[in-house]
Amino acid sequence: MDRKLENQKDLLNQDPKVELNSQSVAKNPLNSREVKPIQRRRPLRKNSRDKNSKPEFEERVIAIHRVVKVVKGGRRFSFSAFAVVGNKKGRVGFGHGKANEVQDAVKKAIKDAQNRLVSVPIYRKSTVPHEIAVKYLASKILIKPAPRGKGIVASNTVRAVVELAGYTDIYTKTYGSRTKINVVRATLKALLKLRTINQVAELRDLSPQQAQAQKV
């Protein structure tokens, strides 16, 4: 019993630290590799352009119609949307989309309008170069140039088209059918028939000054 107590005392008195020699260090597999410092990941920067940048093209929904189809199982509802897209710099388009949901129909209409963009002339960065009258089905529209600062004189449907096209001073008057779709198509038809002074001069084989003196 005395020997056991003495052995236990010897174990308690021993230093718990372990002495490392060169052999034990070499045998350690962790020391054979180079320990690389931990690299901290950089925080992701939020794109500041998304907040400040404006989309190049703006869109406006002209009309949304609900379509009902009668089948054997009952009625099926779908939606038809019409939208106008423009960059206010002479590019404008009109599109149509169909879907079972309103949001999907609007997205398709906007995408269709972006695929149908056309270029229209803007005189002095504000108005049309000359007066023009156009008929589309039962709708008629008259467009006249206006002095700077006058603003847009038009219905809400026509205003959506001319504003997105880039006109800021313009007179318009609609006659006949006031159906929104026909009015939009008549407006676009009129804008596409506009000609600048240089274009008229080339068609008539005149100088720009001579073409400006004549009626377009």
UniProtKB/Swiss-Prot annotation:
Keywords: Ribonucleoprotein, Ribosomal protein, RNA-binding, rRNA-binding. One of its GO terms (biological process) is translation. Residues 20-31 have a biased composition (Polar residues). Residues 57-120 form the S5 DRBM domain. It comes from the Bacteria. Residues 1-55 are annotated as: Disordered. One of its GO terms (cellular component) is small ribosomal subunit. InterPro entries: Ribosomal_Su5_D2-typ_SF, Ribosomal_uS5, Ribosomal_uS5_bac-type, Ribosomal_uS5_C, Ribosomal_uS5_N, Ribosomal_uS5_N_CS, Ribsml_uS5_D2-typ_fold_subgr. GO terms for molecular function: rRNA binding; structural constituent of ribosome. HAMAP family: Ribosomal_uS5_B (MF_01307_B). The N-terminal domain interacts with the head of the 30S subunit; the C-terminal domain interacts with the body and contacts protein S4. The interaction surface between S4 and S5 is involved in control of translational fidelity. Part of the 30S ribosomal subunit. Contacts proteins S4 and S8. NCBIfam families: rpsE_bact (TIGR01021). Belongs to the universal ribosomal protein uS5 family. This is Small ribosomal subunit protein uS5. It comes from Mesomycoplasma hyopneumoniae (strain J / ATCC 25934 / NCTC 10110) (Mycoplasma hyopneumoniae). The gene is rpsE.
